[in-house]
């Protein structure tokens, strides 16, 4: 879990401290939940302003606050230009302290299921940090990154979006080493214009990979050629049921789940999944 002095956070965020240079552990954005020892970020939105709730954050255990203007509170504060952007900056700073495989997953459908299954598989080799609930946006992802600790061997991060540039921003915080796009479908079309726009937005994840990263591409999706183009600078592993792919499978489902024979260059394996659906 994130742990540092307030002065270190201020240096990262180019902020100004008022009050004591305290040590904090973890970050919080919600005064309705416990925040023992945490740095509270006073976020603002159309219908709320976290700056009005510093006393509530303090009662929940927060020891300091990140604010966009000085507040009348005994809590030490670090003043930044934009608390929402600062939340992301601090999350990225903390993520860079860990040299572990980071799997980022997005897509119109199935990303939560794929994230949960990936976490389950990797947990057999060591502790895997994973996105909790729906914390897959520009607030939730930094909160997830802040939970990284020395005991984590992997991170599995879900990313959601409803407009262009959002996945690019999230990937810029997480620095994934492996990127997975499950598919592109007609979800949130109002934010992307059309299905091509959805596919390009999801493909921002591949474009953000470093040259030594791995893009995992669904060859059954009509936009696989576009994603291959966006991932042309890195390693690609493709998968599919209906096309020739590096990882392919035979699938048979019933009301109780699915029987799958998975084929790879290293051999085959048969698994029974207690999940309906293809």
Whereabouts are the PLM-identified features?
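Phosphate-binding loop of NTP-binding sites
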Residues: 87-219, 225-232, 264
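Short, charged/polar "capping" segments at the starts of alpha-helices
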Residues: 70-74, 221-226, 246
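N-terminal leader/targeting and accessory segments in enzymes
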Residues: 1-89, 93, 270
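Adenine nucleotide phosphate-binding catalytic loops in nucleotide-utilizing enzymes
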Residues: 195-199, 234-278
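Conserved beta-strand scaffold positions in the cores of enzyme catalytic domains, especially
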Residues: 17, 77-79, 102, 127-130, ...
């Amino acid at each position: 879990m994130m742990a540092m002095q307030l002065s270190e956070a201020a240096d990262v965020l180019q902020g100004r401290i008022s009050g004591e240079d305290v040590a904090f552990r973890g970050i919080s954005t919600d005064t309705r939940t416990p925040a023992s020892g945490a740095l509270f970020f006073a976020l603002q939105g159309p219908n709320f302003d976290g700056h009005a709730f510093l006393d509530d954050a303090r009662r929940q255990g927060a020891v300091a606050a990140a604010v966009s203007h000085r507040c009348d509170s005994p809590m030490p504060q670090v003043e930044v230009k934009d608390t929402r952007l600062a939340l992301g900056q601090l999350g990225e700073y903390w993520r860079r302290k860990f040299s572990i495989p980071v799997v980022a997953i997005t897509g119109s459908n199935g990303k939560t299921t794929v994230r949960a299954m990936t976490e389950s598989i990797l947990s057999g080799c060591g502790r895997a940090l994973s996105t909790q609930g729906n914390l897959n946006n520009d607030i939730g992802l930094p909160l997830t990154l802040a939970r990284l600790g020395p005991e984590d061997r992997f991170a599995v991060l879900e990313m959601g979006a409803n407009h262009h540039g959002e996945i690019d921003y999230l990937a810029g915080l997480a620095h994934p080493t492996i990127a997975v796009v499950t598919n592109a479908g007609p979800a949130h079309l109002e934010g992307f214009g059309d299905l091509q726009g959805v596919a390009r937005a999801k493909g921002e994840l591949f474009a953000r990979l470093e040259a030594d990263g791995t893009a995992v591409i669904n060859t059954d999706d009509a936009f696989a050629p576009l994603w291959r183009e966006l991932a042309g600078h890195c390693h690609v592993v493709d998968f599919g049921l209906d096309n020739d792919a590096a990882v392919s499978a035979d699938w048979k489902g019933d009301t109780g789940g699915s029987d799958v024979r998975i084929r790879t260059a290293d051999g085959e394996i048969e698994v029974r999944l207690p999940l309906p659906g293809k």
